[in-house]
Amino acid sequence: MKVLLDTHAFIWAITDDRRLSPRARNVLASSELWWSVVSLWEAIQKAQAGKLSLPLPASPFLSGELSSNHVRLLPVSLSHVLRVEELPLHHRDPFDRLLIAQGIEEGWPIVTADPWFARYPVDVIW
């Protein structure tokens, strides 16, 4: 099964954070993992703003973790961007809205602890 990881789900997985739910851990261990380029961008933005602490500069650290954990990077397509316009404004975070649109367009569940995702027609794993 292909799954799309929210920003925090990927960060918590690679740092073995206890906040990652047992169900999410099981799914991550048995699925084809994808992380959106949008989430990569969000993580870099958070690291630059001092809201995310990483052991190395964000770009090389995250690139290395993607590779060593066999996580594929999902680019943003035109269909993803166009789908955002169709989404109700339950959630106003632009990173999350695009991630939700990607999950819908690809037909993949999203691994996230964010309760707002459940308001959209996308399967949520947590």
Model-derived features: positions:
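Short glycine/proline- and charge-enriched loop/turn segments
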Residues: 22, 125-126
